[in-house]
Amino acid sequence: MTSQIKLIVGLGNPGPEYAKTRHNAGAWYVEQLARWHNVSLREEPKFFGHTARIQVDGQDVRLLIPNTYMNLSGKAVAALARFYQIEPEAMLVAHDELDLPPGIAKFKQGGGHGGHNGLKDIIARMGNNNNFFRLRLGIGHPGTKELVAGFVLTKAPSSEQSLIDAALDESLRATDILFKQDMTKAMNRLHSFKAEKV
């Protein structure tokens, strides 16, 4: 396998009241990735989340959606990464991104947490190692910092949700390129995509 990714994490909050909120964009991606590969996510208490395993060119890639609240995401990630001896450089973490508009998604390696509590906890629990890959799923920004908490915990209007969904679809295609070729080609594909309003 050309890709070195061995763990893909989708961030979100647990429970039906959060399932359709913007903050769960990362979890949506992993749910769709599991469907794409015809596997079911199942609860695994020792990893504090729902997990699945897919095979890419004979190599296992683990999928994880933490069952913890967003600000404790690192608990699940660290537990699974330690158990399977997966280094941060072999992890891809999908999360909602305020600094990108709906309809845009981008891969990135390393960097800070940008105020995202899920990323913040993962970095802390991975020994302050931030060198994992991220899939940043644009949800847009409400305009001021004070509005962010309410914004991420509400549903996007259908006009924005359709753009987010289109970017999720393209992210799945880019992930396929990542598996079959490499991150550079996957980035080139994804970073040239912009969903258009219907």
Curated annotation (Swiss-Prot):
- Can you quote a single GO CC term? cytoplasm
Q: Which GO terms describe its molecular function?
A: peptidyl-tRNA hydrolase activity; tRNA binding
Alphabetically ordered keywords of this record: Cytoplasm, Hydrolase, RNA-binding, tRNA-binding
Give the site residues for Stabilizes the basic form of H active site to accept a proton. Answer: 96
Matching entries from Pfam families are given as: Pept_tRNA_hydro
Q: Where is the active site?
A: 23 (proton acceptor)
Could you tell me where this protein is found in the cell? Cytoplasm
Site annotated as Discriminates between blocked and unblocked aminoacyl-tRNA: where? 13
Give the EC number(s) listed in the UniProt record.
3.1.1.29
Record text on subunit structure and interactions: Monomer.
> What is the role of this chain?
Hydrolyzes ribosome-free peptidyl-tRNAs (with 1 or more amino acids incorporated), which drop off the ribosome during protein synthesis, or as a result of ribosome stalling. Catalyzes the release of premature peptidyl moieties from peptidyl-tRNA molecules trapped in stalled 50S ribosomal subunits, and thus maintains levels of free tRNAs and 50S ribosomes.
Protein name, entry field: Peptidyl-tRNA hydrolase
- Native organism is Aeromonas hydrophila subsp. hydrophila (strain ATCC 7966 / DSM 30187 / BCRC 13018 / CCUG 14551 / JCM 1027 / KCTC 2358 / NCIMB 9240 / NCTC 8049)
